[in-house]
Each structure stands twice: as structure tokens, then as C-alpha cells.
Regions:
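Conserved N-terminal beta-strand and adjoining loop/helix that marks the start
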Residues: 1-19, 39, 90
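A generic structural micro-feature
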Residues: 2, 32, 79-85, 108-113
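Short connector loops at helix/strand junctions that flank enzyme active sites
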Residues: 5, 13, 35, 62, ...
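Conserved Nudix-box catalytic region and its N-terminal flanking loop in Nudix hydrolases
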Residues: 17-56
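Internal catalytic or translocation cores that form aromatic/hydrophobic pockets or channels
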Residues: 51, 72-73
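A short coil-to-beta-strand element that immediately follows conserved catalytic motifs
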Residues: 61-69
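Active-site-adjacent beta-strand/loop module that shapes the phosphate/pyrophosphate-binding cleft
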Residues: 75-102, 117, 136
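NUDIX/MutT-family hydrolases
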Residues: 100-138
Length: 149
């Protein structure tokens, strides 16, 4: 598919950890982690996408959200090329008990299980784990490159 896909992702923080799901690229043989969210539907605001996707996939309600930034993500997954414009939000989960759960299990639209877990930002910063989309870690820790003017 040669189209740019707009998506919205939300970062949920729990001390030094963030809520992510684990993915696996069979072609690269690579395990990676990504924040939760999904495709923005026509006529839908990005923050509403975050709320809808989290309810659909994990059956969890999202409270307050705050816009963090936008990333452009050009990548390959399982041998296919993709191009996304990613609107990133910081958010809070309404059910505070979810911050104590090690794993939150849900279902993707295709029926596959989705397992969200809390991972330390240090694991990504030290290169022990891979966080996608590229640039998300820098956005979260405030290390985006700035132009010298």
C-alpha cells in the first residue's frame, strides 16, 4: 500500500516506565515495543482516536490527554514498507488500578491477543529494548534535535 497513514499514539507513564505492547518482525527477527493507539479515521480527531483504540483493544478508558508532538515514521515491517504521520499524546488511565498490573491483555481488531506491559525508559535508552516509532524516545525525554538559529 503506497499511502501515508495518519495514526495517533498515547504514552501512559508510570514512574520511569511507559505502557507499550510487544511486537515481533518475522523478517528482521526483531522484538520491539510500541505505544498504544492506531489509525485516525476520517472526521475523527487524533485524541479521540486514542480513546477509541484503547477502548477497542484493551477495554480501558483514557482520561486526560496532552499533545506531545508529531513524528514521521517510514519503516518496514515483515518485509512491507509503511509511511506514517504519528501524532503523539501523553495520557492518563481512568482506572488507577491498571498502573499496578504487570500486563493488560486485550484483543486487536483482527482477533489477535494484544499484551500491554510497563517497560522502563532506561531499557530503551540503554539499547536493551527497541521502541518504535523512531524518535519517540527522544520526544519523551526531551532530546529532540533543535536547530541552531
Amino acid at each position: 500500500m503506497n499511502q501515508i497513514r495518519p495514526i495517533a499514539l498515547c504514552v501512559f507513564r508510570n514512574k520511569d516506565r511507559i505502557l507499550v505492547f510487544e511486537g515481533y518482525d518475522t523478517v528482521k527477527g526483531e522484538t520491539f515495543y510500541r505505544s498504544l493507539g492506531g489509525g485516525i479515521e476520517f472526521g475523527e480527531k487524533a485524541e479521540d482516536t486514542v480513546r477509541r483504540e484503547l477502548m477497542e483493544e484493551l477495554n480501558v478508558e483514557v482520561g486526560e490527554v496532552r499533545y506531545l508532538g508529531t513524528l514521521e515514521n517510514i519503516f518496514t515491517f515483515n518485509g512491507n514498507s509503511y509511511h506514517e504521520i504519528v501524532m503523539v499524546y501523553d495520557g492518563a488511565l481512568v482506572d488507577s488500578g491498571l498502573y499496578e498490573q504487570a500486563v493488560i491483555v486485550g484483543k486487536e481488531a483482527n482477533g489477535d491477543d494484544i499484551r500491554a506491559t510497563w517497560k522502563s525508559l532506561d531499557e530503551f535508552g540503554e539499547g536493551k529494548s527497541i521502541l518504535y516509532p523512531t524518535g519517540l524516545l527522544e520526544l519523551l525525554v526531551g532530546k529532540q534535535e533543535k536547530l541552531d538559529l
